[in-house]
Amino acid sequence: VNENGGQTRIFIPKYGIINERRHQLHEVIRLSGINLIIDDMDMPLILKVASIPKERMQVYFIDSEDYFKNRLVQFDKNNKLYKDNDERSIFFAKGVIETIKKLNWAPDLIHVHGWVASLLPLYLRNFYKDDPMFETTKVIVSLYDNQIKGKLDKKVVDKLKFDEIQDKNLSILD
């Protein structure tokens, strides 16, 4: 893609297990500092970046003191699901979309992988549906057969409704 004049950018959560020094992550001040509203709470977005020089590719790390900083991926050290995994997924989805907007980069395609990114298409097509930047953006979702044993918070539907996402788009979560 890059060799043909396109751009590939990667967005991942900055989990606590990612070594910032080894991977030369640094905070992008001009892109950080956005407050994302998650279930009526103001949550500051911290954006860090690293590059893959050989591929001429940027990797953006969506970070949050509350949701990712000192945490593992989906389970805590006692192998229990984090109780706020739903909020973490909402934060990641909104953080990616808001970062793309701040970059003023209209992607042709967004490829979604894994549980933490699973709400991104829902937000893109509902919460951000009137944003002209994403008017022609296509979304591909890769599904895997690695089920998470456990349940999301029962209030996840209410948290999504807070962002004015319609009931008809949430029926699978009921």
Roles of regions detected by a PLM:
Residues 2-174:
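Catalytic cores of nucleotide-sugar-dependent glycosyltransferases that transfer UDP/GDP/TDP-activated
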